[in-house]
Amino acid sequence: MFNNQMLGVIDETTYKHSLQDLTAQRSLGAIPFAGRYRLIDFMLSNMVNADIRSVAIFPKYRYRSLMDHLGAGKEWDLHRKKDGLFFFPSPHLHHEYDEFGSFRQFSDHLDYFHRSTQQYAVISNSHTVCNIQFQYVLKRHQEVGCDVTEVFQDGQSLQIYIMSTTLLKDLIYGHSEKGYKTIQEAVEKESSALTICPYEYSGYAAVIDSVEKYYTHSMELIQPRFWQQVFLPQQPIYTKVKDEPPTKYGKHSTVKNSLVANGCVLEGEVENCILFRAVHVGKGTKLKNCIIMQKTQIGEDCLLEQVISDKDVKIGKATEAAGTAEQPLVLRKGLVQGELMNS
């Protein structure tokens, strides 16, 4: 291991208008994903697996569900007397559309960076799904002698950076004077003054920045060739543990090529779907190519295709709803059948 050489920084200040149907009541990193996880679980687990023992999360808005999910960081072994998981919301009142940038929020909590003893910092967003070994990125960073290492896949930045903690503090100090708001802008504007090295990541990666990408990359994980690249035995993805009984399959239910979490009651037909915990599918109901989140209740004789149902949705008997692969139909959190019919 790398003996706690790295500090983890997760930038949760991003707002994506194209994900507003899924972020109306939560922050980006708290979006449920892959049947039992939240988006932030992937980057946080990557950091912990690289022996990063101090992780700072900088949320901007609607972060109650994120705080509830992360707690004190026990599931990630970050509930520590020294170092651990830190949560740094903005002390300023603002609207979620305000684009003040992450560096302003970093600067509001500079004492955290001053107290940190780690030599290097890993800075990432909360909405990139991958299973990357940061210890190898750091090794390359040290061998080449870079000021900044930026992680790419197929020529596209994954918005993941490694640099010295000293350099990060310098960039935070200078952000107002030099006119950059985020780490991405800082790297671009300082490219002539700093040695910036690309690191090509060859594993599975998905940047979730729209409903279409959320749907596409979620459905990819039904396929073993994708699932096996993300969920590695030697690099586990951790999440908040919730105890549920095994899923109950009714006498006339059929389930094909689907991911099904615990606690469900399935009495209908499910094909190419992802079902989160405690979902109920009524008799005679058919689901195809759907993502059904926690505690959704679907009545009898419904027909749903290419639908994303957020948490706690209630769908009445004989309801039909469909989207497309490019525009899946999103049923917002807490929606009930009457509201759906009138919308």
UniProtKB/Swiss-Prot annotation:
Gene Ontology MF, one: glucose-1-phosphate adenylyltransferase activity
InterPro entries membership: ADP-Glc_PPase, GlgDAde_trans, GlmU/GlgC-like_hexapep, NTP_transferase_dom, Nucleotide-diphossugar_trans, Trimer_LpxA-like_sf
Expression induction or repression: Expressed exclusively on media containing carbon sources that allow efficient sporulation.
Gene3D superfamilies per UniProt: Hexapeptide repeat proteins (2.160.10.10), Spore Coat Polysaccharide Biosynthesis Protein SpsA, Chain A (3.90.550.10)
CDD domains cross-referenced by the UniProt entry: ADP_Glucose_PP, LbH_G1P_AT_C
Keyword Amino-acid biosynthesis: no
Biological process terms in GO annotation: glycogen biosynthetic process
Keywords for this protein: Glycogen biosynthesis
Function: Required for the synthesis of glycogen.
Similarity section: Belongs to the bacterial/plant glucose-1-phosphate adenylyltransferase family.
Protein name (record): Glycogen biosynthesis protein GlgD
The species this protein was found in: Bacillus subtilis (strain 168)
